Design a protein with these regions (language model features):
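Short helix-loop junctions at transmembrane helix boundaries
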Residues: 391-432, 442-455
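A short amphipathic helical element positioned immediately N-terminal to and/or at the very start
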Residues: 3-12
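Hydrophobic, regular-secondary-structure patches
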Residues: 36-149, 274-275, 297-301, 305-308
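Hydrophobic secondary-structure segments that place a key small or acidic residue at a functional site
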Residues: 128-129, 133-145, 153-252
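Internal alpha-helical transmembrane segments of multipass membrane proteins
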Residues: 23-25, 328-349
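Mechanotransmission and gating elements of multispan inner-membrane complexes involved in transport
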Residues: 94, 117, 208-213, 219-328
Length: 457
């Protein structure tokens, strides 16, 4: 009979104590794996999402992180709005003229280039309005360029594709300004299909629901980004909803009344009247300046009194460095203490059994087993408990992660794969268990090594 078989038989003889000790080790390792997995997924998700296809977000003065959370992750509330005319400062002269002709309204010097247009050559600016909800999901009002110009993916090289339908357009004869594209998670959670109508609620999930709906003309393929949780509507239709006119600018504009666009219009020719420029505001502007102009533009914008420019990558890296990574190390320290206590319990369990095993050890010595053999058996017992508990804990830790997908997917868009190794630190678990098992078995092994044969026969 080899040493491993003897060690296994000894553990079976003390199966209750051995099982409980292994269970405590499994619990500690499961907690370590869970912390590494979830923190790794969150960190990679944040890093991937920060590569959003644009360099800067421009919005009202306030918290830069709040602006990023609201615009990129749809998790916070808008700070304030900026005038639509300010968005047009990023357009060239011909762009301003076309926008003025398309929308109408009051605009000073529409023929001149925008203040920042010289830094935008070859780039783009996309307006975004937020503040409403579609069910539990954020309503994002924007232009068709959101899915036409932006890309996604780890390398920011993947175009947005639709599992069904198409991108919304500025105006269609069938739906007017009231078309929408929904993310994959929105469609799945709300049971939406092409042709369905969605209704935005004002301000909060439980706010007053607007009477005018948006027709779903496209459903995005899953992207693994927050856009899976967005309901994207045509910004032109969004402006026509009640309560979406700039404050203190409610005078007659050629519209019957704020928010007078109603669903019954669909049966006939739809009104092409747009909200004038002076009555419009935007929550954020997504900018991709020309070449290396982002840094210069960010400084210039931040010198103004009412607007700020924020780099999403910089803010997310700051969040990771200040909050996510330190929290991960703190949780790892706590869970590692659980593993250490489990290793001590292995030591105590085997050590307490030594008095009952002195006669067995003496008999084995009398039958020809050397002291080294006895020491090796005790160390093997300790290693088997540590490794068996650790493997069970590893499996449990990876199994618990995906169970949280029911919560993390709808709220954050983060999906946890049960076998994915999210951190290189996880590769040190097995060597660490071997070391802990060896150290835990060292003292009992020394006791066994020194057990006198004659005295215990």
């Amino acid at each position: 009979m080899n040493l491993l078989s003897i060690a296994l038989r000894n553990l079976r003889y003390r199966k209750l104590a051995s099982s409980l000790t292994a269970l405590s080790m499994a619990l500690g390792v499961a907690l370590v794996v869970l912390v590494l997995t979830i923190s790794g997924v969150i960190e990679k998700s944040l890093e991937r999402t920060s590569n959003v296809g644009y360099n800067l977000i421009v919005g009202a003065k306030g918290s830069p992180l709040q602006l990023v959370f609201n615009t990129v992750f749809f998790l916070s509330q808008p700070i304030e709005n900026v005038p639509y005319s300010y968005y047009m400062e990023y357009l060239p002269a011909d762009g301003r003229l076309k926008e003025h002709a398309r929308i109408g309204g009051e605009l000073k010097e529409p023929q001149r280039p925008g203040l920042y247009s010289f830094l935008m050559q070859g780039g783009f600016a996309i307006p975004v309005c937020m503040g409403d909800y579609v069910g539990e999901f954020r309503c994002v009002a924007t232009t068709p360029d959101y899915f036409g110009l932006l890309k996604h993916g780890d390398l920011n090289d993947r175009e947005y594709k639709f599992s069904g339908g198409r991108n919304f357009v500025d105006y269609s004869e069938e739906n007017g300004y009231f078309e929408a594209v929904v993310g994959s998670q929105v469609a799945q959670s709300m049971g939406l299909k092409l042709g369905d109508e969605i209704f935005a609620s004002h301000g909060t999930e439980s706010g007053e629901t607007h009477g005018q709906g948006f027709r779903v003309v496209g459903i995005l393929e899953p992207t693994g980004s927050p856009n899976d949780r967005g309901a994207f509507v045509n910004i032109e239709g969004f402006y026509l909803l009640e309560g979406h006119v700039a404050p203190d600018r409610d005078e007659d504009s050629g519209l019957e009344k704020r928010g007078t666009a109603q669903a019954p219009q669909r049966s006939g020719a739809l009104s092409k009247v747009r909200l004038p420029i002076e009555k419009r505001e935007v929550t954020a502007i997504l900018l991709k300046p020309n070449g290396f102009a982002a840094m210069s533009m960010e400084k210039q914008i931040n010198k103004t009194k009412f607007a700020q420019a924020v780099s999403p990558i910089g803010q997310i890296e700051g969040l990771l460095g200040v909050f996510v990574r330190p929290l991960r190390w703190a949780l790892l320290a706590l869970t590692s203490l659980v593993v250490l206590v489990s290793a001590i319990s292995i030591l105590v369990s085997i050590y307490n059994s030594m008095n009952d095993r002195k006669k067995d050890i003496a008999v084995m010595r009398a039958l020809g087993a050397s002291r080294d053999h006895i020491t090796a058996i005790i160390l093997l017992e300790s290693l088997l408990i540590a490794i068996a508990g650790g493997l069970v804990g590893w499996l449990v830790g990876h199994a618990l992660g995906p169970l949280s997908n029911a919560w993390t997917m709808p709220t954050t868009g983060v999906k946890i794969d049960w076998l994915a190794v999210q951190s290189s630190w996880e590769l040190w678990i097995v060597p660490g268990l071997v070391l802990l098992g060896t150290l835990a078995g060292a003292i009992p092994a020394m006791v066994a090594y020194r057990t006198p044969v004659a005295k215990n026969l």
